[in-house]
């Protein structure tokens, strides 16, 4: 424990230095500032060119959204800048993001930020860990807790198991895990507290996916460098503009790729209109095939395994525990989660509304905002119905978490999602800390960056909903 304390203490200032409103050393030296000046302005993302998002001042984003709380700290953070490329979604996101962290609720404010630290640390997401460390201290949290889980109260430490499962293998959550947290005792959780904690955990796990998926960089350095400005909000008629949606891949070849995708989408939509029925057995067979093929969708073997940082390990129990494919060769797979047996609309939403009424409606609005978001454009084309493509992405994310929709033809996934996109989706959803710039660049090379951010919004929400469904189903079974 002494080693863990010393390692965490040494790293703590470094992370707080990059957090909004953070504390730490006086800032980098003159040599570092000169080097940064030579490089020019740094954007909010390592993947997206700075000129793609820095269009207008931060005030334009706040004015467009009408969110005073966003600017309460006097700055717009990098995550908001990138996500703000889609301000209609960001409005719903911010309401839910703000609610469990800052409004009245069963958990103390400092506890909420500590739970967020625990969640983000599972994916080694230093961006979120640093941000919530600063917020933890600003809300009166005990600095000793930041030396590691062993310094936190036993009640918080009891969340480690369900945090681990929600982050990596939510299908393993059972009513016994819920019972262990709620059973009468000295460090017991109330049901209201647990629901808020589960929303926080799943929110921060999925937000870690967005941070890694979009290459979000730390905020302005501690020497007072200004925070990035916000992007221009898109019009309702078109997707947020890029200088050249084909600039990464060579115009004619990319145009052919887009046209081929458009043709596949058109054929699928026509077959749906003709109601060309597929038997239930065939639908189930196609799901099992897609689930099995997902075993082969993995990052390149030359991707180095990220080395866990000591400051992250302070907040993580069983760090070797990670995502494993829902269906593994030679292993007994858990039963498939049939979405019709426990849906968000009919079961999860009503349970959340009953136990956490402030959050249920906002969660539902956020899921719908991401799923239905469209500008009716693809790359250089406008007037496009993208519903089948968005549905394929959403359902593929749920597929890798073992969730099947009986009324969905999983053959559409293979028709619409190229392999590079599948690799990216699975990496960002399941082990986001392995995401690389190359993965980001390889998929949809002919699409706008804002469209790639849109994919990450679908990833964020589909992943969060999948984990919540497993947790809420376990609570329902515990209560019945």
From Swiss-Prot:
Q: What is the lineage of its organism?
A: Eukaryota, Metazoa, Chordata, Craniata, Vertebrata
Localization, per the record, is: Cytoplasm
Q: Which organism is it from?
A: Pongo abelii
From the UniProt entry, list the residue stretches annotated as the region N-terminal domain: 66-239
Chain residue ranges for the region called Disordered: 20-45, 222-252
| Its biological purpose | Functions as an intracellular leucine sensor that negatively regulates the mTORC1 signaling pathway through the GATOR complex. In absence of leucine, binds the GATOR subcomplex GATOR2 and prevents mTORC1 signaling. Binding of leucine to SESN2 disrupts its interaction with GATOR2 thereby activating the TORC1 signaling pathway. This stress-inducible metabolic regulator also plays a role in protection against oxidative and genotoxic stresses. May negatively regulate protein translation in response to endoplasmic reticulum stress, via mTORC1.
- Phosphoserine is found on 249
Arranged from A to Z, the UniProt key words for this protein are:
Acetylation, Cytoplasm, Isopeptide bond, Oxidoreductase, Phosphoprotein, Ubl conjugation
PTM annotation (N-acetylmethionine): residues: 1
**Protein name as it appears in the record:** Sestrin-2
- Which residues act catalytically here? 125 (cysteine sulfenic acid (-soh) intermediate)
Positions bound to L-leucine: 374-377, 386, 451
